[in-house]
Design a protein with these regions (language model features):
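Conserved core segment of the aminotransferase class I/II
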Residues: 217-284, 367
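Conserved glycine-rich beta-strand-loop-beta hairpin in the small C-terminal domain of fold type I
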Residues: 265, 269, 283-291, 300-312, ...
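Flexible low-complexity scaffold tracts in large eukaryotic assembly proteins
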Residues: 34, 166-169
């Protein structure tokens, strides 16, 4: 009987394909796990100490919906120094996922079109559907670059928003300054909201990070500390954009998440002064290790940032390949979790080097084992 209570919108989305892979692998014993979407290192001690101190100091009640003033002020000063936009306002969100939910609810009406680049972060398509948006995919295969003319061709009079993610999950692709500028200028020309998911901005290995907000003062930026400071469980993000949009997101946060976790915001304040350059360099070296080990057997595009590689399977579908990998005690994610194609696999190199070496050995062995 309770099945009848489920809303229609919930039938538009499916459980995450990543969760399905984890369920499939539940009986694996000590798998070589290259599926992880979070850093392998622990939260820095200075952040833990700040969190514990905030709890001891009684920072355990609600904060202001928009976030604590010291954290907002510190981020706002950095944003102002980078962009020099008079109307760019910051607020603190309950994670970047919470921010995505807020911005889509604040901007999308039923039937509005949302442009998403394929491959895409798994959450984008589902959240857009939940708010009644119509997905319009722009393919970036084979090298995952942004062809702005394809975006222009995809725009209609119903286009409301473009979701952009660089460095990208799942491809690791980092958009060039030229691509980023062209996309930002197109959004401005067409009066379309451009949402830039910058959660991996710290992890750029071959070129500097460039935000579309540098070229379009109305870009809405979603960022956070989950990946850069290994705080995925803390649920702390931040957003900056035009005040008119930010105020609507704050209003919606008041009636949904209420606020970001209060003591975690004080930990975030400490995190902003925490040097993570050694971790970024470590991940650059891990990227290089995996690229060197796999280059003879796999086509490697992207992988200039984040901590992922999106590899074309040497045989079969991504699903077939991952099924065989699990039989060989290797846990990876099929590409159709992130794409309308099933031709690739996603691996994460957020792991200790001996595990990466074992994973690369299995991947190379599987490449020669055509089904």
């Amino acid at each position: 009987m309770s099945e009848e209570w489920i809303s229609d919108r919930m039938h538009l989305i499916d459980a995450s394909g990543i969760r399905k892979v984890f369920d499939l692998a539940a009986n694996m014993k000590n798998p070589i796990n290259l599926s992880i979407g979070q850093p392998h290192f622990d939260t820095p001690e200075v952040i833990k100490d700040a969190l514990c101190q905030a709890v001891r100091d009684g920072k355990n009640a609600y904060s202001q919906t928009q976030g604590i003033a010291p954290l907002i002020e510190k981020i706002q000063s950095r944003v102002d120094a980078e962009y020099h936009h008079d109307d760019r306002q910051v607020f603190i969100s309950s994670g970047t996922s919470g921010a995505l939910m807020l911005v889509l609810n604040a901007l999308i009406n039923p039937g509005d079109e949302v442009i998403v680049f394929d491959p895409f972060f798994v959450m984008y398509s589902h959240l857009a559907k939940v708010v009644g948006g119509k997905l319009v995919f722009v393919e970036t295969y084979p090298d995952f670059s942004i062809d702005v003319e394809k975006v222009r061709d995809a725009i209609t009079d119903r286009t409301k928003l473009i979701l952009f993610n660089s460095p990208s999950n799942p491809t690791g692709y980092v958009a060039s300054e030229a691509e980023t500028r062209a996309l930002a200028e197109l959004a401005a020309e067409k009066n379309i909201a451009l949402v830039s998911d910058e959660i991996y901005r710290a992890f750029c290995y071959d070129q500097p990070f460039v935000s579309p907000a540098a070229f379009n003062e109305n870009v809405i930026v979603i960022d956070g500390l989950s990946k850069s400071h290994s705080m995925t469980g803390h649920r702390l993000g931040f957003v900056h954009g035009p005040q008119s949009v930010i105020q609507q997101m704050i209003k919606l946060q008041q009636y949904t998440f209420v606020c970001a976790p209060h003591p975690v915001q004080w930990a975030g304040l400490a995190a902003l002064d925490c040097d993570i350059s050694d971790r970024v360099e470590e991940y650059r070296q891990k990227r290089n290790l995996m690229r060197d080990r796999l280059a003879d057997k796999y086509e490697i595009s992207g992988a200039q940032g984040a901590f992922y590689m999106f590899l074309k399977t040497p045989w079969g579908t991504g699903t077939d390949f991952c099924t065989e990998a699990i039989k060989n005690n290797l846990l990876i994610i099929p590409g159709n979790v992130f794409s309308n194609r099933d031709t690739h696999i996603r691996i994460s190199y957020a792991q200790e080097n001996p595990i990466l070496e074992q994973g690369a050995e299995i991947l190379n062995r599987l490449a020669d084992h055509k089904m």
